[in-house]
């Protein structure tokens, strides 16, 4: 050991006197100082100090090593330098604080005298810091201990420690000086030392120069906070601001998107800012960008928006009197007010006249002075004043003119009165249609119990115009109130506008039958139960601990060191057939991973059962009480003889606690709605949490999600992905679900759709992916309340009362509600992809209005009783569009109540999870009880737990609205609810103009034949005899599973011409053979062909391409309907698509068509034609139609109402001799002709229907005159020919 110390001393001496130390290569050596520790890094093979262990060094007088634990390490980056005004922690500078590299509020840096080696030795003897650390290998240097040594090597060790300290001190100073030089070069600051420590290498000259620079810097900074040097500082600031805005159009955008910290720093650095004057300058200059920038960077209080200036004006006064509407509206939205001096019109007019007169007098005075004096310095200043007063004179004249030309505003528009609660009414309105050259600055709402508003019951003046909505509170329930609204501008109040309806009574739907609210007092009951359960736990835990202390013997403490060598439980890297819990912490695009770049995963159990539904539901409740995991573990006894369920719960608690300890946080986030499973037997329970910022975790780091996915993709096998692979693949969907499950609906009344499907072990609810915490819905209106009158109307309509008894006047209050319901039902059916004729058995839930929470209310739309919950293996009669999700019922209730009833669900989950665990424990105790006293105590405890469970279930049933609605919806006799057929007419769907995306149908052509029955019988007689199984069914149905046979319609009820079953089968064999999908391709331009026409046809018109592009988008050539269809109502005409695959089945006539296709509307049933061939004509939105006979061919047709026309499809009739070519299975190509409208149709009688060729034997379905007129017309070319490869 002595030899080793001598060797180290020689090496230290050599290293100190070497040229490398003098010339400075030590500057490249990296080391850090943290507190009083120095860490070294080997530079080359000659260096002996390795940066493997940090050493403590003795304190140096005037040195930089502080014993304070809060001192921060110094790095090689300028970021590690002390911040502004940071005080040195050296021990020798106790007389006066010395500040480092920055500005101090006191004195600048003072000179300090470096201490000699003698004084250092004196302090070394007084305090001996602990510098020893045990080394792991041989040859480690042992520095002096704090206690005096008794061995003979003490003197040598003391000398080594002193030399080592001096050496480290000099290195520290040189390194800090180099850091300051580097920082000064990069930032341009004055050179300054980074430490107040003094050493031999620090010269007095440099300190004197540095101190003077620091003083100058301090003085310059203190000058910035002095008083303004000129009263025109605000004008200069505005001028600079305007130049910035004019120089760059994105200046306002950049300032607008600054963070709050940047805005605060900008406010601090704005020198001599006079907010009120700057705002006045911006408004007077009509600079909208400057006004927006000032309002964003500063609050209205800082700008003194409502403080009048010396002329008695506010910024809003100038904006409205100059009729600057954009600036006035911005100021009004931020809370600006008019000047309080203008109490009347006369006072405003007199004030403006005074301002104009003063400005005019001042201009005249200055003009005379400028003309009398020559070119002097004072004259130049007066010229500037003259220009300023001339500009102000023009401003006041403009304000006076604007005031004189303005008039009082008109009545507010669209004033609507709504019943918002049983004691309040809400009035909404819009700005007047004409403000008469003056911005409206306030509104007045008045209400009275008499129609003539005499006397008034009250009024409200609205100064805050952020929202044009006013709620009148404190009203009497059931009392009728009349309300009117009037507007105000600088010319006074305008006329009042009565609301629509003119009166209303405050009420709520519960007033109809005096029902108690569903959500009342449940949270208080659960809080009381939770306190009782905790008290019971504490009582039994005290009894168990006392038994252990009195009867139990002292347990032996293991003195083995074996646990030191055992690896503690860490994160799982690979999954091996078990139950695991994974946690996803994310911030934007970053995700928390372990040090091995893995998702934090902990094993719960390696021998779990295949079904964990109940355990998962219990863990779902556990996710609402992460902070109680420790208490819950302590209250659960651990026994190897416990049941399997209890052992699984205990393992879940242990794994959760382990994950919390590894991550260093209690909150693990929310649970994903289902566990992730794979074919290897792994089950992964996932929790997700979004953090506010990138925290530093002890056992983790942050990584981009895309990078983690790419790394995992390169390592995983695509054949059999594990649950971890599935998690990474679907990570974006999981995060999207987590974000959207936290979102809430805006306040209002909604119409929801209740649809469930059941599996073997659970029931699932149909929700949207955008908002999985609520049912599929559409918004009815903004007002969430349903009044007593509206609810009474619904109840009457759900009974025997018909819609004819409802008053349909526009003034009727129920008419608006009826219209809103009608629109909401139609929109919801379209959203869930259900045609109206299939929804004829749907009805509204009339038992209650679901008051979800946060001013959100729901009415429910219920399917037919048999379709409310789809059983396993049962075909869904309708398939919704994409974007929907089947959420387990319990998970839906969790995320739903977490969003709308946070306090209740938190208490319920805590209480339910604890009581369920207690139930398992008491059952286990009851099984293990032997003596009578133990059995009695176990039964008593178990009965207490059962009582708790019963009380919790009662509270839960009161809040669980979905089960009540489900029970009501599945009740068949008697049929309850409001049928939607009283709200919307399903038979009118075919007459609508726009094509609903849910039906995808093609309108039919009326038949010219007076008897469809005769044609049908003739077609059947001409066809080959066949049975109904072979395709001679009277009504074509896609499949038996889609429609009920009882819903089949008789063709004599429909004004259609049908193809016979034989013809349909022949077409399927000829034109639609094969299973390849049909593809339409744009082909060359050709004319419409008739039997007597040239195949080339007439030449194309100039607008052919334009007309084709304009009308092709409205053609419906393929059936995009859902897979399945519900039953059809009588009187409906379901259309048929034109293209489809051949589907084999037991019915031969199904061979060429899939269930996607609807009825085919043809000119003639006896002529066979491929389904993809025909002429398609755009249907005009004006009055058009077909004549019933040739004499009426040119007459006007029936008027079709709607926003746009329907595309009408009709196939051409072909001669009999061409029918054989259609039966040729080798024919590969069919043509579709698109026929545009002629430009003369708007001004002439419509001739909309054309025939491709004359039909033989006089059986033309359309008059021949139409064909003869249209065929030679050169202005009606065929737009395009679409080729379909079949």
Curated annotation (Swiss-Prot):
Keywords tagged on the record: ANK repeat, Repeat
Origin superkingdom: Eukaryota
GO BP annotations, alphabetical order: behavioral fear response; equilibrioception; locomotor rhythm
Tissue: Expressed in both the suprachiasmatic nucleus and dorsal medial hypothalamus.
Segments of skewed composition (Polar residues): 999-1011
Residues covered by the Fibronectin type-III domain: 411-507
SMART domains: ANK, FN3
Biased composition (Low complexity): 1260-1277
Annotated region (Disordered), positions in chain: 999-1032, 1086-1106, 1187-1207, 1242-1286
ANK repeat residue intervals: 274-303, 311-340
Outcome of substituting residue 748 to A: Fails to complement ENU-induced null mutation
Disruption phenotype: ENU-induced null mutation in mice produce several neurological abnormalities, including deficits in vestibular function, fear learning and circadian behavior.
Segments for region (Highly conserved peptide sequence): 748-755
Function, as annotated: May play a role in neuronal function.
Protein's UniProt name: Ankyrin-repeat and fibronectin type III domain-containing 1
